[in-house]
Amino acid sequence: MRAESWTWQHPDRSSPAVEDLSLDIRPGERVLITGASGSGKSTLLHGLAGVLPAEGASISGRLLIDGAEPSQRRGRAGLMQQDPEAAVVLSRVGDDVAFAPENLAVPRKEIPDRVREALQAVGLERLPLEHPTAQLSGGQKQRLALTGILAMRPGLLLLDEPTANLDPDGALQVRDAVLSAAEATGATLLVVEHRTHRWAAAMDRIVRLDAGQSGSWAGHDSSGQYSADENSPGQHSPDHFLAALPDWSPPSPAGETLLRAEELAVHRHPPTTTWRSHQPPAPVLSRVSLSVRGGEAVAVTGPNGVGKSTLLLTLAGLIPRHGGRLDPDPETMTPRELIGHSGVVFQEPEHQFLRATVAEELDHRQDLLERLRLSHVAQANPFTLSGGEKRRLSVGTALASGAQILLLDEPTTGQDAAAFADLVTLLRDHLDTGGAVIAVTHDQDLLTALQARRLEVTSCSPTASSQEQPSAEAPETASSPELPGFGAVRSTSWLGRRGPLGKLIALVLITLALVASIDLVSAAVVVMGCFALLPLAGIRPLALMRRIWPFAVGALLAVWGTAIAGEESGRVLVDFGFTTVSTGSVMLGLALGLRGFAMVLPSVIILSTTDPTDLADSLAQQLKLPARFVLGALAAMRLMGMLAQQWTTLGHARRARGLGKGRGFGSRLASTLSQIFGLLVQAIRTATRLAVTMESRGFDGGPRSWARPAQFTAADLLVVLGGAALAAAATAAAMAAGTWSLVW
C-alpha cells in the first residue's frame, strides 16, 4: 500500500480530512493508526477500501494498493466500519458471514468451514447460524462485522476501532482473532484504535495522523518499546487516560435520591402479544433494583448482549417496563418534564441529532463547544462529523438540556486522551452540582475517573446487583419490528419449511384463477381455503386478521365505491339523486372487494412463511435472475427492517429531547412530519453505509458462489399441487354456480 501526497477533502468542509499524506506499508506489515478524533483515520481506511465518494470531493495525489487504484482492487481489502449496524448485510448470522466468501466465488464446500472458523475466532460460536442479526446487541454486531471480514481472508485488513463497543474479555478475544488471521494468511493489517495498549506490542509500527496533516510513524526498538510521544493526541498506554486528570472526589455526603428502581423487568419491546405469539416477550432482565442520589455515578457493566442498553432506555422512561417500579416514573412525564429529569445519550449518536448545525444542537453554548473541542465544526452538519466528534456532541446535547440525571450509552467510545479528559471533567462538574450519571460502559478508566458504583449485569434473568459477579454472555433476545411480508425468523411450520419456488408457483396459479373472473364464488372459495390451511402455516386466524386489516378495510372501500359509482342494474336499493345503489352494483362491489382481498390473503400467508434469504437463493439459482439484483433487493429488505427500528428509536430520541407530540392535531402532524424527515435522512445515510459494506466485501456483478443450494423437493411439489387444486376448486365452484365470467 502506498500514499503519494494524498489529499481528500469532504465537499461540505473547508479543510481536508487528510492532507498531503505520504506513506509506504509493506506486504504483511502490521500497522497501528492513531491520532486525535477527527484527524482523518477513518477517511484513510475508506480510501484504501476504494469506497470514498468521488463526487464533489477534492482529491489530489495518489493512493495505491498493489500498484493500482483501490477501486480496482475491491475484494482485496476487507473494511470494518465504525458503525456495526451498517456492517451487517443479511438477516441471519450464518448468511451474513457467508456473504463475502460467496461474492469472491469461494467453492461451496469450503464456505461452511470458513463461517465456523470465523465465528469461533471472535467468540460467536454459541450463536446458531439461523440466529437473526436484528436480535444482536451493538457489541455482538461489531463482532459479526469482523467475522464477515475474516471469512473473506483478504490480503489487506482495514479495521476501524474493532474493539470500541466490546467488553474487556471480548476485546482481547477479537484482538487475538485479528492477529491470528493476519499471521495465518500473511495479510497486511491496518488498525485504527485509540486504546493502543491492547495492540502496540504486536504491531510493527505506529502511524500517527495529526489534524489531517502528513502521517508520522514510530517504530519500536529491540525491547518492544515505542519511541512515539505517549502524550501525543490519540496515543494510549494503559494508565495514560487517568494520568492526565486532576485529583477529584465526588460530593460527600451524596444528595437526595433522584431515581429509585425496584424489581424492574425490561425488554426492548412492549409487554404485548405479537401476530405470531400468544405470549408477550419474556423480559431480558428482571428483578433489577437501583437507587441513585445526587452527586453519584453508576456504571452499568457486563458482557455484550445481556440487555444493558435496554435497561438504560427503560430507566429513561423511553421503553415501557415489563414490571417493577420507578420513582419518579418518567413514563408519566410529558416531554418537557422529561427533559429536565433525564438527558439521554443513545448507543448510536446520530439518532438524537435534530438540528442543522453543531452549534444549534448545543443551543449555541460557546462553553460547551470549546470544552468538547467542537468549535472548529460549529457550523458543520452534525452528520458529517467523525465518529468521536459525534459522540462528544451527543453528550453535549444531554448536558445542554440541564437534566438532573445523565443516562449515557458508551459515552467515551472513539475518544482520544484529550477528549476523554474533557468529557470526564464535564461529567465531574455535573456531579459537583448535584446531578447524577448512569452510564453503560466497558471503559474501566471512566469508572475510575468518576469513582462510579458498579451495577454488574451478567445474565438475562438473575437479579442485577451492585456487586461484581462472574460474566456469562447471553444474547439479548429482543425481536425486531417485522415487515408486512417477511419475518427475520424462519418459520418452523410445515409451510415454512417448504421451498420458495413451490410456494411462488402455487401463488401464481391461485392468482391467475382470481384474475380470470370477477365473481363472489371463486373469491370466497380461495378465502375459505386459505383460512383452512392456516394451521399448516402456523398462523392464528385472529393474529392474521390483525396483520391484514388494512387490506380488509381497502376491500370494504372497494365495495362501497363500486356500489355507489357502478352502473345501475337490477332493482334500485337507494336513490341519492346524483347516483343510485342497485342490486347489480352492490354485487359487483362485493365481487371486486372480495376478489382483491382473496388475492392479498394467500400472498401474505406465503410471504409470512418464506425466508427472504431462501427466496433470494431460489430466484438466483433456480429462476436465474441476476445475483446483483436479487442480493441488492435482499439488502434493501433488511434496510426496511432497520428503518422500522430507527423509526421507534427516533421517536424515543425526540421524546428525550423534549420534542414529543403535542395534544393538538397541528402539533402532532408537525411532529410526525419532522420525524419522517429524520427517518429519510437516516435511510439515506444507512443505505450509503450498507452499500459501502457490500462493496468492501466484494459485491459486484462478477461470478459468485452460493453457500446453500436451492432445491425442489417432493414436498414442494405437494405445495404446487395444493395451489393448483385450490385454483381449480375456485374456478369449478364459480362455473357450477353460474357466476364465472372470463374478464379477458
What are these regions (language model features)?
Residues 34-36, 301-303:
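The feature captures the beta-strand-to-loop junction immediately N-terminal to the Walker
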Residues 49, 316:
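Helix-to-loop junction immediately C-terminal to a conserved catalytic motif
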Residues 110-127, 365-377:
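Conserved ABC ATPase "signature" region
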Residues 132-136, 140, 381-385, 389:
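Conserved ABC ATPase signature
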Residues 146-147, 395:
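Hydrophobic anchor residue at the start of the ABC signature
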Residues 149-150, 398-399:
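ABC ATPase C-loop
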Residues 157-161, 406-410:
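Catalytic Walker B motif of ABC-type/P-loop ATPase nucleotide-binding domains
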Residues 475-522, 526-535, 645-744:
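Transmembrane alpha-helix interface motif
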